[in-house]
Amino acid sequence: MTTAHRPTFDPARGKSNTQAAGSISHTRSLPSHTKLKYRYARISTNTDAMRKTLLENEGGLKQAATKLVAEQQQAETQVQDSEKELSDEVKAKIIEENRDDDDSGSDDEESDSDDSDSDSDDEDELLRIELERIKQERAQAKAREEERLALEEAKAREEQVAFGNPLMNPVAIKRKWNEDVVFRNQTKQARKEDSYVNDLIRSDFHRKFMNRYVR
């Protein structure tokens, strides 16, 4: 590309010029870009906000699941402790009754040995039945608690799946400014049906021509 059309800002000098080479420089010869350009701070977009919301929802779901697991473990521990305490109480009661029987008179033992044995057997049987009944009640309560926790966890999971993803949430479509205009779409015409026929005799033009000039 030629530069003949450009003006000469720095004309050529002959050999008679005694000035030192490079002592005079034009403004255009000086460096113009003396500062570095830095990147601007990133502008937050809808994608960033959506990502942040999803991360927060995920963290909330994890916390809820951890809380449910902790409650379930605590309930199991309480049931085990109560069963252990109950069994200890039953054992202590049996030992105390046996001790009372041993402290009774020797004469009574000899005369009523058969009756006391039968009574102790009956009491042991009743205690055993009572213990089994209490264990069944504890097991039923534990099963109900586990079922309740499972239902709550499933409900929380369904809500997270339904409302955690912003893309699946119902979106309210903004109405246009001319939605409620009184004379809206007046110039809009109904589409006419295509009456084209690939036959000159049965075409609309031929029929109009015959009706106008022949009949």
From Swiss-Prot:
Annotated localization: Nucleus
Span list, region Disordered: 1-34, 72-125
GO cellular component terms, semicolon-separated: catalytic step 2 spliceosome; nucleus; post-mRNA release spliceosomal complex; Prp19 complex
Basic and acidic residues: compositionally biased ranges: 81-97
Biased composition (Polar residues): 15-32
Any one Gene Ontology molecular-function term assigned to this protein's record: RNA binding
InterPro entries documented for this protein: Cwf_Cwc_15 (IPR006973)
Major localisation: nucleus
Highest taxon listed in the record's lineage: Eukaryota
Segments forming a coiled coil: 60-162
Record's compositionally biased regions (Acidic residues): 98-125
Family according to the record: Belongs to the CWC15 family.
Name used for this protein in its record: Pre-mRNA-splicing factor CWC15
Gene: CWC15
